[in-house]
Each structure stands twice: as C-alpha cells, then as structure tokens.
C-alpha cells in the first residue's frame, strides 16, 4: 500500500487484486498516482481518505459495500468524486449510486478510454485536473 506522490491521488477500492492491478496500471499510465485498498474499511482507515481527489470503488465487497462507503462519506460531508466499477450492473444499484452522488457507474469489463475520460471529467469538476 504505497503512494507514488503526485497531487492527484486516485484511491482504488476493490476486493479483487487483479482488478486493483488493472486499474492501477491504467490510472498510473495516465500520469496519476494511485493507492489500492482491498476494502471500504481500509480506505476509511488510510491516508487516502483525506488525500485522494477521486475514488474508484467496487459495489459488492466483503464487509462494507461501496454504496455504504458512499453514504458514510456523504454523511461526513466528504465531497470526493466516486466512480463505481462493478461486475454487478443491477439497474437499481446504478440508480441508487448515481442518485446518491456517484459520478459514474461502469460495469466490468470496462472500456479503458471511457474510464479515463470519466476520471478526468471528475477531476475537472472537482477542480483537481
């Protein structure tokens, strides 16, 4: 769990290490820093909670789900842009996530170019691009 220092840190929260690795390679190839974490609880306990300018998270994970993480951050007044990348493309989950403020809800397998476009749009809207 190391951060390559850059003012634009993207936190990746997914319980699947292969997904973490794929997202990390993609995001870092675009010049952004990353921190990969295996659970929502790890994110909440990490320095990324306060330093990340964008959060990419899975919906279904052991322990706290991505939707529960989003609700907790929102309740605390955290305005980090959240992008959900999930294998579960349930329309109801998508509606819940986007209705609660998520930037985007992408299903796996995702298109690399689309994901990078969404990340940059989120950074631009939050003033971090």
Please state what every model-predicted region is.
Residues 61:
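Receiver (REC) domain active-site loop signature in two-component systems and cognate sites
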Residues 17-35:
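Two-component/phosphorelay signaling modules centered on CheY-like receiver
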